[in-house]
Amino acid sequence: MTTSPIANIRNFSIVAHIDHGKSTLADRLIQMTGGLSDREMAGKEQVLDSMDIERERGITIKAQTVRLKYRAKDGKDYVFNLMDTPGHVDFAYEVSRSLAACEGSLLVVDASQGVEAQTLANVYQALDNNHEIVPVLNKVDLPAAEPDKVKQQIEDVIGIDASDAVMISAKTGLGVPDVLEAIVTRLPPPKGDRDATLKALLVDSWYDVYLGVVVLIRVIDGALRKGSRIRMIGTSAAYDVERVGFFTPKMQQVDELGPGEIGFITAAIKEVADTRVGDTITDDRKPVTEMLPGFKPAIPVVFCGLFPVDADDFETLRAAMGKLRLNDASFSFEMETSAALGFGFRCGFLGLLHLEIVQERLSREFDLNLIATAPSVIYRMRLTDGVEIEIHNPIDMPDVVKIAEIQEPWIEATILTPDEYLGSVLKLCQDRRGVQKELTYVGARAMAKYDLPLNEVVFDFYDRLKSVSKGYASFDYHLTDYKPADLVKMQILVNGEPVDALSMLVHRTRAEGRGRAMVEKMKELIPPHMFQIPIQAAIGGKVIARETVRALRKDVTAKCYGGDVSRKRKLLEKQKEGKKKMRQFGKVDIPQEAFIAALKVDN
């Protein structure tokens, strides 16, 4: 039996910006409560970040959970359930469901860097879930740490009292015992009724080669027992529970989980897509009818085409995507073909980091070499006959004459930056058609709120923001609504043929600059052929930019010494005819580098 008195359970998550020491603090808590022995911890950083990419980039992608036992100073034994949540905006939905499973949060802030944009976003989510929040200042042993200033900042920006914030250094373990005591004394226990009908929240799920789908749950009411039959309200599928248990971070099996507890179950579920995150699990024999509040399915925001560089890898790519989908239900894909790139997939992602990580996992775990087309967003179009359509691939755009109005998605962005870079950050937002909403100062840092079109952000906004602010600015966004926009479909023509992989929807005012930059880049990278190749950027039938790749010259008159000029002219005319014919029928080989470079062009 695992069941602990509900008053001695504490469910909490750690909220922090990337790199503020969240996973390191989790390591220390596990070590000090004896979750793993020192030998098992040795040489392992970030125990909860199980993917290589998570460790390398120092970010948490999947939510993880661990149960710790702690004997407090009052002599009682407590059970802590720690949910390690992702810190990045793309994984905000993973954060929201992890927070819904907890009653309190530790807010970790780097004492040398202060509050960042994503700290704000996640704290507001925690406050929305009525969490009790304990501020923790990490890295206080650094020479650059300014704890008093950061405390003031927490109070000014977030509006929670930070006077009794816990001072720690997660790396050395300084102050971590105080965190354990604060969890006991300052965070509330869960509520729940053991005798009520079973009601549990599905927090996360992942695929395990041996066990099938492992489902992470938080029991709200009732008890979840091994061998019982459960039903998911969202998909109305029923399963027999095979295993029940929790992580310490190792898997430990038990007979049942009671109210307020967090653990896992396995039930011969075949696909992660069958387990919707945020779904409600109940008893199949006497089900509850209403779902737990506040969950929505993850909707892809950014789309792009992924094509294998080597056409023979297509089947491998298809299998790899299926495997990734097992673990990441928010990632969607469908097959597409491109005249330039062959067979591939059109994929949907939650945001740019998600796109980058999926791409990196495909190339790293499955050894695939991929080309990604330009990222695009979902546009809404009202046609002249009153029909409304949504498109996420510029190739599918109907004829201009049939379109009455195009609408594009807008976001609200919150940007925090040191004062000295404010000018260049504001200029960047202005260049990207941003509309400033507010500008406030927090100590020596400025906080700007902007409305921006998502179209302008998906491309390379984050990279540009980091470069104009020397890496100091942080950025967070959420979708707001759709607004009408003057967008045009720009195509790149090589030797008069449109290259489908390079067509994109751009704002009319930006089309010329974008088109010119792309054709110049293509000109550098397409090798000369026997005939000259025009590279054009066009909107409809109007060419807005053009470059020409000069032909290779073969000296056909070399074998004529002296003699009549008409002989030379005849040979030159013949060559001219041949080149003309070649230009008509010749095929231009566009190297992969040219695609990749054209897609990475700056405006």
UniProtKB/Swiss-Prot annotation:
Belongs to the TRAFAC class translation factor GTPase superfamily. Classic translation factor GTPase family. LepA subfamily. Signal peptide: none annotated. One of its GO terms (cellular component) is plasma membrane. InterPro entries: EF-4 (IPR006297), EFG_III/V (IPR035647), EFG_V-like (IPR000640), EFTu-like_2 (IPR004161), G_TR_CS (IPR031157), LepA_C_sf (IPR038363), LepA_CTD (IPR013842), LepA_IV (IPR035654). It is a peripheral membrane protein. GTP binds at residues 19-24, 138-141. Keywords: Cell inner membrane, Cell membrane, GTP-binding, Hydrolase, Membrane, Nucleotide-binding, Protein biosynthesis. GO terms for molecular function: GTP binding; GTPase activity; guanosine tetraphosphate binding; ribosome binding; translation elongation factor activity. It is found in: Cell inner membrane. The gene is lepA. PROSITE patterns: G_TR_1, G_TR_2. NCBIfam families: lepA, small_GTP. It catalyses: GTP + H2O = GDP + phosphate + H(+). It comes from the Bacteria. It is an enzyme of class 3 (hydrolase). This is Elongation factor 4. The keyword Protein biosynthesis applies. GO terms for biological process: positive regulation of translation. It comes from Nitrobacter winogradskyi (strain ATCC 25391 / DSM 10237 / CIP 104748 / NCIMB 11846 / Nb-255). The lineage of its organism: Bacteria, Pseudomonadati, Pseudomonadota, Alphaproteobacteria, Hyphomicrobiales. CDD domains: EF4_II (cd03699), EF4_III (cd16260), LepA (cd01890), lepA_C (cd03709). HAMAP family: LepA (MF_00071). Residues 7-191 form the tr-type G domain. Its main location: membrane. Its EC number is 3.6.5.n1. Required for accurate and efficient protein synthesis under certain stress conditions. May act as a fidelity factor of the translation reaction, by catalyzing a one-codon backward translocation of tRNAs on improperly translocated ribosomes. Back-translocation proceeds from a post-translocation (POST) complex to a pre-translocation (PRE) complex, thus giving elongation factor G a second chance to translocate the tRNAs correctly. Binds to ribosomes in a GTP-dependent manner. Coiled coil: none annotated.
